[in-house]
Design a protein with these regions (language model features):
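Residue-level signal for alpha-helical context at structural boundaries
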Residues: 58, 123, 193-201, 243
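Short, aromatic-rich amphipathic segments at membrane interfaces
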Residues: 164, 169, 194-220
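Acidic, S/T/G-rich, low-cysteine, solvent-exposed domains in lumenal/extracellular/periplasmic regions
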Residues: 1-191
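Hydrophobic alpha-helical transmembrane segments of integral membrane proteins
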Residues: 220-222, 228
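Juxtamembrane interface at the cytosolic side of transmembrane helices
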Residues: 228-243
Length: 243
């Protein structure tokens, strides 16, 4: 709670914040309330779902693939790029907050859903993963929410996953760009948000021809040993003269 109070004071003073919350079952909170999630819900109407997103777009159902982004400075140049979120929870908005601009920033495809039957998943049971339309949030599932206060000019981005930003996943697809852009935007540095696709360069190894190979062979077989031998003779002659 003390850490949350410090973050709260920082945000209320106009600071920017990037939050990455793992699914509750993967944290130390387990069934206990998360103070940070409570603060985000009460102050900004952000709902961090008690769920795990299932997405069969990838070969691993618990790796959510984001292929759609809201129109926002963070993602304006990311259209066409996908980003991967291993073991992520849903992040959405609720209620009315007239002094806030809130945007669901990152979305999965329609065939994904936020699975709420975590007990079965934790039990290691062999279950068929199917969404429950009456309980689970059906896709497209929001994986991140961005908030901008109209009065205090503070900025927040809340992700339902932290693994997408670790060393193993940072360079995967658009993950690194999404994280860096989020930090730049939260810090009020929109001018640093530059995502210019680099033209791919095709490199082809051209093997040397016979003439070139002959020169290389001649150099290694004759010139290099000859130079070493010549240097040795010169040193020997100089020593003879001194002696």
């Amino acid at each position: 709670n003390e850490e949350v109070e410090k973050l709260k004071a920082f945000v209320e003073s106009g600071g920017g914040l990037v939050v990455m919350e793992e699914p509750l079952v993967l944290t130390d909170f387990a069934d206990r309330p998360d103070p940070l999630a409570t603060y985000l819900s009460e102050s900004f109407g952000i709902v961090l779902g008690n769920d795990i997103v299932v997405d069969f777009t990838s070969q691993q159902p618990f790796v959510a693939v984001a292929n759609s982004y809201a129109s926002h400075p963070i993602t304006q140049k990311m259209q066409g790029l996908v980003s991967l979120f291993p073991t992520t929870r849903s992040v959405s908005v609720t209620g009315e907050f007239n002094d806030l601009n809130r945007t669901e920033l990152v979305l999965t495809a329609e065939n994904a859903w936020a699975e709420t039957d975590l007990q079965s998943l934790q039990g290691g049971e062999q279950i068929e993963l199917q969404p429950d339309p009456g309980v689970d949030m059906l896709g497209p599932v929001s994986l991140a929410v961005v908030i901008e206060s109209l009065g205090k000019q503070n900025r927040l981005i809340v992700y339902g996953d932290a693994d997408f930003a670790n060393d193993a996943n940072f360079m995967q697809y658009g993950n690194g760009d999404l994280l860096i852009n989020s930090i730049d935007w939260a810090a009020g540095q929109e001018n640093l948000i530059k995502l210019t696709p680099k033209d791919s360069i095709q490199r082809v190894l051209i093997p040397p021809g016979r003439y070139t190979m002959g020169l290389i062979l001649f150099g290694f077989v004759f010139l290099v040993p000859g130079a070493v031998l010549f240097s040795g003779i010169v040193v020997w002659i100089q020593r003879r003269k001194r002696g």
